[in-house]
């Protein structure tokens, strides 16, 4: 579609743009104490954005703005997931004490800008658009990570984030330039057509360029060895932003990786087809398998050694990126299906774990295991809910985490004997993760003195806890609605429109 025709299908992004402008202008009229009210403008904008997505014809599969963006149910799925994560984080941000004393108008406006950037990430089908989308998300993240300007840890987190982000962006941009030189185009399908004619040194150059591009993608999902920013940034950032970074950009990153490999290395067809990839001359499935093993193993082994729960959850998120990467070398629609289901389940349990950390800290506690000592007796509701999140993150039934891992392992095993070793390594890593997740439960209920006084969280906190804990349990028992939603979303636009 040309630019004017594309606007008719671009309403969600247009609403987001207006939301950002209105939020920034509205903040000018609020005092410092009232700036938190700007959250209402962003929430309203996100609700309208969601309605715009829902009202669009889900059967339309096309491209927008001169073939720069894809419009399909696959993108709509991830946009909805990103909106859900953002809405939950806005409610979580209202309950954190870390933002006290700061104007939060820019905070909520930056969240909306990040959402816009992630919308571009999940729809991009041109390398230049991929780069711009990642930069929009990254720059917003840099500012939000350092939002606590009077906190040295937050300043350090932002600085490290900028340095690592610039490094990975530079490597990715170098890879993009090589691909453009070889293919003569930045469009995914044009690159695919040119790739079939590569020979000798050109084939090697394309392999090298793909690895460089993967560095940029790996940076967004915290895959090893592009994960170095994650622990320090997660620990130093406002915990609400840490929770957000662990979920939304990770989902957008996986959406981008899947689309890139399907439309560059595959035939760009619907994911309902049994075969995801048709071009396997380059060893990228083996590369992703090794990346998955290294990512989940390092994440789990280092998480075991942490005494700070926030930092432990950072390494945990690295391990979960490894679990999701396991499904991609299967070259099948079942693998993509598994990743999408896992991301839905992961959203609730991971945001829930971080929200418990936020609430405990707001009650005068801290982020270390010692601060959680006896928490199950002092705050029984919080302790029970945290236990649910830890069990789910481990992947124990009947929780959402188990269903997510079940689909991942099923996809790997069903792909054939060549990936059985990957399933075995994944199983061993799941057992390893049991140690540090259950350590949290042990500290809460079996260490420290039992408290005579019991603290019951206020109603808004209880509401958020239940909004995260109930789906974590329900989706472990009845996940058919999620499975159906994912199935309907597994459609990519084809080369012939």
Residues covered by each model-derived region:
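Alpha-helical transmembrane segments of multi-pass membrane proteins predominantly involved
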Residues: 1-497
């Amino acid at each position: 579609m040309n630019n004017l025709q594309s606007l008719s299908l671009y309403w969600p992004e247009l609403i987001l743009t207006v939301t950002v402008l209105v939020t920034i202008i509205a903040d000018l009229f609020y005092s410092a104490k009232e700036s938190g009210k700007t959250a209402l403008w962003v929430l309203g904008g996100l609700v309208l954005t969601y309605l715009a997505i829902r009202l669009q014809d889900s059967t339309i599969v096309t491209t927008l703005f001169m073939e720069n963006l894809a419009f399909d149910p696959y993108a709509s799925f991830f946009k909805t997931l990103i909106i859900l994560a953002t809405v939950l984080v806005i409610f979580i941000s209202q309950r954190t004490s870390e933002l006290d004393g700061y104007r939060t108008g820019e905070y909520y406006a930056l969240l909306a800008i990040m959402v816009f950037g992630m919308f571009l990430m999940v729809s991009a089908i041109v390398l230049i658009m991929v780069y711009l989308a990642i930069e929009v998300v990254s720059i917003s993240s840099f500012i939000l990570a350092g939002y606590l300007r009077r906190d040295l840890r937050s300043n350090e987190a932002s600085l490290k984030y900028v340095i690592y982000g610039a490094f990975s962006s530079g490597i990715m941009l170098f890879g993009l330039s090589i691909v453009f030189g070889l293919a003569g185009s930045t469009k995914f399908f044009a690159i695919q057509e040119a790739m079939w004619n590569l020979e000798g040194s050109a084939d090697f150059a394309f392999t090298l360029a793909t690895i460089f591009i993967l560095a940029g993608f790996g940076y967004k999902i915290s895959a090893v060895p592009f994960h170095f920013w994650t622990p320090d940034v997660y620990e130093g950032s406002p915990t609400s932003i840490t929770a957000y970074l662990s979920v939304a950009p990770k989902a957008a990153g996986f959406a981008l990786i899947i689309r890139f490999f399907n439309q560059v290395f595959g035939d760009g067809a619907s994911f309902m087809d049994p075969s995801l990839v048709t071009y396997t001359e380059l060893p990228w499935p083996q590369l992703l398998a090794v990346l998955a093993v290294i990512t989940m193993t390092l994440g789990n082994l280092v998480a075991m050694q942490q005494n700070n729960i926030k930092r432990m959850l950072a390494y945990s998120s690295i391990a979960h990126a490894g679990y999701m990467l396991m499904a991609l070398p299967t070259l099948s629609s079942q693998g993509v299906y598994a990743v999408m289901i896992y991301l839905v389940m992961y959203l609730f349990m991971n945001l829930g774990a971080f929200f418990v950390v936020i609430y405990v800290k707001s009650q005068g506690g801290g982020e270390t295991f010692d601060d959680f000592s006896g928490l199950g007796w002092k705050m029984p509701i919080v302790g029970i809910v945290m236990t649910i999140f830890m069990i789910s993150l481990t992947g124990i039934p009947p929780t959402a985490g188990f269903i997510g891992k079940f689909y991942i392992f099923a996809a790997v095993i069903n792909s054939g004997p060549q990936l059985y070793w990957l399933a075995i390594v994944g199983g061993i890593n799941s057992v390893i993760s049991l140690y540090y997740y259950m350590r949290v439960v042990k500290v809460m209920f079996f260490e420290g003195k039992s408290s005579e006084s019991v603290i019951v969280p206020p109603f808004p906190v209880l509401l958020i806890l239940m909004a995260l804990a109930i789906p974590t349990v329900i989706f472990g028992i009845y996940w058919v609605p999620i499975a159906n939603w994912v199935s309907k979303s597994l459609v990519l636009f084809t080369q012939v429109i």
